[in-house]
């Protein structure tokens, strides 16, 4: 495999630093990925040479910034194969995107007695907004359970759907188990029953190509900071026909057509009616640079490289006798585990002393922890800049902890 890993690693400045006197092994990209120099430079260039408020001025700087921002909207649409740039809404991240759908689509189209379906593997961001909506409206939440291997049984979905069911919210890739759900098949079954489908793609877009039209989903959400882009910027894709029917969630500048103290307010068309206030313009520019970066490398080569690395990591970790792995064999991005009876926090703290960064805790997936009957897990996540040497350092660190703690 000819993936240019040395060049890729050189593109990420932070990977060259040391932590606790050790070369950094960064295995926490599922929480937030490191940034290539191209993304850092893009934001710096915008702030230094081109900053201005967008959509609010006739002067050259404002016009240039507006044009660049809208160009990124088109770029995002192309990246996920949306039908139109007007189906792309800039938000702060995945969490805000799901809240926007829950509070705009949900409060407009759902009513007491309706039901929605979520899965047992969802991130809290795809649980709590629906719980809040259900509590306010009297909507029932139905939970699609997992199999023993941490996967969804497709045939179990039909039993959850009846005449009251309106919406399915499902992750494409589990942020804990790495389970890659068969979204196209899931969406087809849900759409055949008349459901609207929201797909959480936060853990998918950096690992594999995404085509929202081929998937058939109504909404698709993801964050920039996990895609090697800046923090504070994310995307909500929504089918145009739905977005045009949805009321604004937040009010303010930029999302209006007219405002009158006597005749009320009329709102801009989608997507702008959902973008109240001043946007994170620099973050949008950085997101565009991040998409350029992964597109230039190619998502298929990235996927192939990461899958090879994942298979190697699972094979090496499986040799540690006291280590418990969670999730299916075929997965993307993340490896959840526990080491004997040792608390995940202790394992993570020891690894940090060896310069190895992993994530520990419930990973914003407490229902999943309850499913496995554990309070917490360790999670190592792989990205396009990780290597077999990183995996070997992790394995050696865990073996050292095993000997130290018994």
From Swiss-Prot:
Pathway: Cofactor biosynthesis; iron-sulfur cluster biosynthesis. InterPro entries: Aminotrans_V_dom, Aminotrans_V_PyrdxlP_BS, Cys_dSase_SufS, PyrdxlP-dep_Trfase, PyrdxlP-dep_Trfase_major, PyrdxlP-dep_Trfase_small. One of its GO terms (molecular function) is pyridoxal phosphate binding. The modification N6-(pyridoxal phosphate)lysine is found at residue 226. The keyword Lyase applies. Its EC number is 2.8.1.7, 4.4.1.16. Its cofactor is pyridoxal 5'-phosphate. GO terms for cellular component: cytoplasm. It comes from the Bacteria. The active site is at 364 (cysteine persulfide intermediate). Cysteine desulfurases mobilize the sulfur from L-cysteine to yield L-alanine, an essential step in sulfur metabolism for biosynthesis of a variety of sulfur-containing biomolecules. Component of the suf operon, which is activated and required under specific conditions such as oxidative stress and iron limitation. Acts as a potent selenocysteine lyase in vitro, that mobilizes selenium from L-selenocysteine. Selenocysteine lyase activity is however unsure in vivo. This is Cysteine desulfurase. It comes from Yersinia pestis.
């Amino acid at each position: 495999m000819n993936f240019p890993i040395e060049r890729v690693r050189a593109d990420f400045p932070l990977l060259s630093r040391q932590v606790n006197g050790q070369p950094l092994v960064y295995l926490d990209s599922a929480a937030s990925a490191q940034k290539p120099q191209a993304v850092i430079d893009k934001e710096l260039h915008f702030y230094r040479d081109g900053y201005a408020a967008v959509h609010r001025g006739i002067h050259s700087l404002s016009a240039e910034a507006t044009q660049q921002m809208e160009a990124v909207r088109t770029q995002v649409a192309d990246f996920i194969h949306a039908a139109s740039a007007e189906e792309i809404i800039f938000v702060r991240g995945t969490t805000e995107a799901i809240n926007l759908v829950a509070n705009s689509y949900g409060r407009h189209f759902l009513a007491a007695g309706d039901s929605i379906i979520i899965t047992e593997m969802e991130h809290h961001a795809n649980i709590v907004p629906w719980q809040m909506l259900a509590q306010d409206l009297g909507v029932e939440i139905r939970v699609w359970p997992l199999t023993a291997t941490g996967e969804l049984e497709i045939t179990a979905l039909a039993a959850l759907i009846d005449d009251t069911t309106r919406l399915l919210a499902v992750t494409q890739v589990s942020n804990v188990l790495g389970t890659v759900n068969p979204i196209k098949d899931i969406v087809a079954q849900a759409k055949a029953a008349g459901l609207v489908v929201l797909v959480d793609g936060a853990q998918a877009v950096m690992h594999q190509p995404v085509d929202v039209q081929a998937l058939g989903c109504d909404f698709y959400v993801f964050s920039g900071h996990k895609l090697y882009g800046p923090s504070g910027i994310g995307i909500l894709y929504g089918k145009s026909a739905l977005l045009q029917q949805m009321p604004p969630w937040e009010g303010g500048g930029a999302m209006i057509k007219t405002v009158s103290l006597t005749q009320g307010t009329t709102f801009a068309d989608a997507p702008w009616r959902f973008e109240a206030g001043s946007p994170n313009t620099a973050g949008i520019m950085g997101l565009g640079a991040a998409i350029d970066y992964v597109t230039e490398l190619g998502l298929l080569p990235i996927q192939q490289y990461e899958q090879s690395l994942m298979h190697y990591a699972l094979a090496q970790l499986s040799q540690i006798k006291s280590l418990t792995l969670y999730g299916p064999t075929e997965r993307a991005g993340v490896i959840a585990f526990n080491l004997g009876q040792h608390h995940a926090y202790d394992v993570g703290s020891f690894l940090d002393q060896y310069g190895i960064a992993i994530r520990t805790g419930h990973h914003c997936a407490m229902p999943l922890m309850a499913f496995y009957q554990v309070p917490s897990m360790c999670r190592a996540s792989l990205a396009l800049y990780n290597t077999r040497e990183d995996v070997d350092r992790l394995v050696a660190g865990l073996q050292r902890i095993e000997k130290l703690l018994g």
